[in-house]
Amino acid sequence: MNKRIFTACMAVACILPVFKAEAQSDYFFRSKKKKPATEAPAQKSKFDQTVTGAKKSEGPFTVYFTKKNEILFAMPDSAFRREYLLSSRVAATSNTREAVAGQMSTSPFLIKFSRDSINVYLHTPQVGAMVREDDPIVPSFKKNFFDPVLKAFPIVDTKDGKVLIDVTKFFREDEKSITPLTILPPTMQNANVIKGMLDPTASIVTEVKSFPRNVEIKSMLTYKTQPYSEPYTLIMQRSILLLPEKPMRMRLQDNRVGIFNSSRQYFSTDKDKVESFKLIHRWDLQPKDSAAYMRGELVEPVKPIVFYVDSVFPDKWRATIKQAIEDWRMAFEAAGFKNAIIAKDYPTKEENPDFDPDDIRFSCFKYATTTTANAMGPSFVDPRSGEIICADVIWYHNVLSLVHNWRFVQTGAVDPRVRKAVFDDEVMRESLRYVAAHEIGHTIGLMHNMGASYSFTIENLRDPQFTQKYGTTPSIMDYARNNFVAQPGDLERGVRLTPPIIGVYDIHAINWAYRLVPGAKTAEEEKPTLNAWIAEKKDDPMFTFGAQQFPYTIDPTDQTEDLSNDHFRAGDMSISNLKIIAKNMDKWLLEKEARYDDLRDMHGQLMSQYYRHVSHIMPYIGGVEHFEIRQGEENTLSRRFITKDKQRKAMNWLLNQARTYRQWLAEPAFLNKVEQNSGMTDLLGKAMVAALFNPGSIGRIYEAEQSGQPGVYKLTDYANELIDAIFNVKGNLTDADRSIQNLAIDLMSAYSGLSTESKNTARRLSEELDALSHKLSEDNLPCALGCGDHHAAEDGADSFFRLTAFSKQAPNEVIAPLLLQQLKRVQTIYRNRKATGNAADRSFYDYQLLRLERLMKTN
């Protein structure tokens, strides 16, 4: 017991000093009390430090937008296994000279990403060359077609399997691959191209949005333009779109059907050469019910084509635009698809908060408030397959003046409804519907078909029943406008004056491009069926595709702005109508107290329409008709030279017009009233004469003679008949005769090499005629889609056209002696006539004889 008490007391004694010490310490050192030790906070990673405070959004990868307007991508491993489309679009601009709001500044292109421990690399994959995955040459192919690196982005940090990179500069600076400025080679000049240097102090990334399939980045870029350092500011929207893991099955192109396409090369050990082929551009339409589709039933597509119509369109035109979009349903129905294309209004924020007309996911019909009289319909593709990913129609405000002028000069003599400065809405809707449908045709893959209208006869175009069914052309993708062949009284008989809603060729082309081929598993397996569809229509000229020609028209059967297969009669009938308009338009367009500016402009439209008809006859001189033939077919000619009879007819037609057009188109009293410069009307006559001596045309006449084809002109016969037609004029000379003969002597002196002075005259004339052609062709709705311009070269996009720049020239040893001989013939004609005619004629003959004698002596 005592032992237990002792032990307890000792335990207390041992404890008390401890508590006391603590108490003393607390008492004496209370002012210096230390806080209990805590664990030091963990230092933030560089990843977290960089993105702190940034707005985060999730898309194909994570995107951060910092308070300093920086953009950062956090990319998981999965992002490096996919491919994307990168686009650059003008969302707003301070100057519409080069591009308008809503327009792509560059063609979207394929990209992918790779990484190492230092950088993330932005590649532009090679798409122009292909190889089969199991071909033994694949290792060599990959080494020789390595995907180039467009940009490298240093890795900021890595976290949770994601690498962080800063891409701000790429979207804030003047990155050449997505620049809004057009980059031209030093040898090329274009007055519409804006040149300038980026002003980094006035350029910034303004907004970033992410969605499951895409990232949208807006930047404000400001340039100081040259040479005056004026500011040029744009809001650019760049899209990065995640592409399907498995590309759409491609379809092979055929020149007998006009579909936009991309060129490719195929490397294989199974072939003795590198094969070239083209894949067409089309939307990926797949039936909701494949079994029903294959039974021939109309089936809705899984994903229809949807166009959103700009909310700023005037209400009176909006329904017409939507109607024109959905007019193409009849073509898709021929391919087995119901409701394949849909027109919708721009949705409100309540209806679709994610809608953005500049987002690459949305295809839109956009309104551009500019003075340009045009419209265009580009589409943008996945270059791996040709699948159209998105498309736009850019509708320029002043397109109304374009269609107004067409209707007035082409049908004003026949249709009283168009004899006014402002059309009734009903009439304007007819024309707007055609233009809108034409542009939508481009967005679904169709190229211009310039040969379509050649399949109709004059009689067809004046037949009420025929025109009500077929309009003016089998394809609205032709530049065949209104029925200028129709004569007064034809409208009352029921003749249609406008193009069809959709042409029969257009329906055929959509069927060929979009109808699924039963049983085919590859593009190669589709070919027999596709060829059979073409063969079914081979003997019907309505289904012939006529390729556009560039830069010159040498095939008279594939022309722009023409109607019928008889350009001579069509021209005569339209010119007869133009004379009626010229005689009456000052009364029809009378606006009391107004200036004559509008009337002068409309006279310019008359000249443009007249020049179109002249231009339709010029290609017959030395002309060539082209055919798309295949081995094994009966017709083995890919080209046929225009016959002597047609060329002679063209020669006489042009000379007759050159002698007579001033009598009605350049009536002095009218020109003086409206202050119209007669210099341009004078150039019309010179253009006709120059066409008869054109070296390219002369060269093709010579080539035809060498070809052995029957019925062609011999060059000497052409020259003899031309000189007779120009210089052997009965009776007194008119002013037009003297002008024609003087120019003919100039041109022969120049092209024979006998006169340096005449060479200079011919060169100046060529420049003047180029300017005239450009001026009078401004209202031809270029669409920005002709001759390979549909897409930029980055994705290999193309359109089938005939290159006509390198026509064979007649050798100098042939042409020079021939022209010298003809000049001597002219001398003889003048000597025989110098004592005849009136005083003006005799003076003219004396002058020309003196001129020719000096020319001969000098040489």
Predicted feature descriptions by range:
Residues 45, 319-326, 330, 434, ...:
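Solvent-exposed, polar/charged alpha-helical surfaces in well-ordered, non-transmembrane soluble domains
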